[in-house]
Regions:
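PLP-dependent enzyme catalytic core of the Aspartate aminotransferase-like
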Residues: 3, 108, 272-273, 284-332
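Conserved core segment of the aminotransferase class I/II
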Residues: 11, 36, 55, 65-71, ...
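Residue-level recognition of strand-loop junctions within catalytic nucleotide-signaling folds
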Residues: 174-175, 255-257, 303-305
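Short, conserved charged micro-motifs
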Residues: 260-266, 307-311
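Conserved glycine-rich beta-strand-loop-beta hairpin in the small C-terminal domain of fold type I
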Residues: 215-229, 240-256, 293
């Protein structure tokens, strides 16, 4: 990536989740003068793990996205709404996942640059959660370039690249910002475990980890998102359903517009036919605005086999048909 890095640019933590805890409380929360510095999520829904990172819950602030909808293909995509997004002197830091858990969304290179530029005006660090990004685990199905910059802290994890139990998080950024996070970690646990790092160092230096990511992990999940999408295209009834563009990560995100019940109620209906999903409202944890869309989405894991995914989507389509049809019948 053309970077000139020293050990002062890098921090190893006990998993990337720890990075967001350090950042949210080092850069966000109340200052000594009593001013509240906000932890901004520029696009919601996003990773639920951010919901508990701040010891000052009121510091978290999330923004509603814009929706690009393809009515014909039954697809849609979230984008940051720059007409609403505010980063100012009250902002402590910005955090977002790329690719995104839960939606599989990839904020574009240009959008990342724009967010970083807005934040740079106020010396605000931007943490890009790259747990699913290249170079490993490389769980992106669309072109994306890891972004670096003076105020960008690039946060990586090896959990999805085959080392979940070792809890290895990697932060790459400006030495001044890395130093702040390092001081926070020193108070918390001195340093992260060395044993997992030794395993990772061997896998990285040999080139095997990058090869595994590109030639095994990425194709494995890319096939599954295709199976899921193709099955929904064939099986879904004539209702306003939209699948988020499958751009990365290990989840699919389904929006059932005008769903006649809540996402939690639909989740219970799916359980009755042996299909387990996660109600989407879980991922709008900070977003307090009343928005019906929040109760109309589902996160679907891609960890099952291709056969199981196809069968589950057929069952989901049948349940959706029954639920929407029951409303039509009740209106007559």
């Amino acid at each position: 990536y053309g970077l000139e890095l020293s050990d002062r640019h890098i921090l190893i933590t006990g998993g990337s989740q720890a990075l967001y805890l350090y950042a949210a409380n080092a850069f966000g929360g109340y200052t000594t003068s009593g001013e509240l510095k906000q932890v901004v999520l520029p696009l919601c829904p996003d990773y639920t793990g951010y919901g508990g990172v701040s010891l000052t819950p009121e510091a978290l602030l999330a923004y509603k996205p814009t929706l690009e909808i393809d009515e014909v293909r039954h697809r849609f995509k979230y984008r940051p709404d720059f007409s609403q997004l505010e980063i100012n002197q009250q902002t402590g830091c910005v955090i977002f996942s790329r690719p995104c858990n839960p939606t599989g969304n990839v904020i574009s290179d240009e959008e990342v640059t724009k967010i970083a530029h807005l934040a740079a005006s106020y010396d605000v660090p931007v943490l890009v959660d790259s747990a699913y990004a290249p170079p490993f685990p490389a769980l992106n199905f669309t072109e994306m370039t890891p972004q670096f910059g003076e105020n960008i802290i690039h946060c990586m994890s090896l959990s999805k690249a085959g080392l979940p139990g070792e809890r290895i998080g990697i932060a790459i950024g400006d030495p001044q910002l890395i130093g702040i996070l390092e001081s926070f970690q020193t108070n918390a646990c001195i340093h992260s475990s060395r044993y997992g790092q030794a395993i990772a160092a061997k896998a990285i230096s040999s080139g095997k980890l990058a090869d595994l990511a590109l030639n095994v992990i990425r194709p494995h999940y890319r096939r599954k998102i295709k199976v899921l999408a193709n099955t929904l295209d064939a099986a879904m009834p004539d209702i306003p359903w939209y699948l988020h563009q499958g751009e990365g990560a290990i989840f699919a995100w389904l929006w059932l517009k005008d769903l006649p019940m809540t996402d939690w109620e639909f989740y219970q209906e799916l359980k009755q036919v042996g299909v387990i999903v996660v109600p989407g409202s879980t991922f709008f944890f900070v977003f307090r605005e009343d928005w019906q869309h929040k109760q109309q989405c589902l996160r679907i894991s891609l960890t099952a086999t291709e056969t199981e995914i196809a069968e589950a989507m057929k069952r989901l389509a049948q349940v959706a048909q029954q639920v929407y049809q029951s409303v039509v019948l009740s209106q007559h």
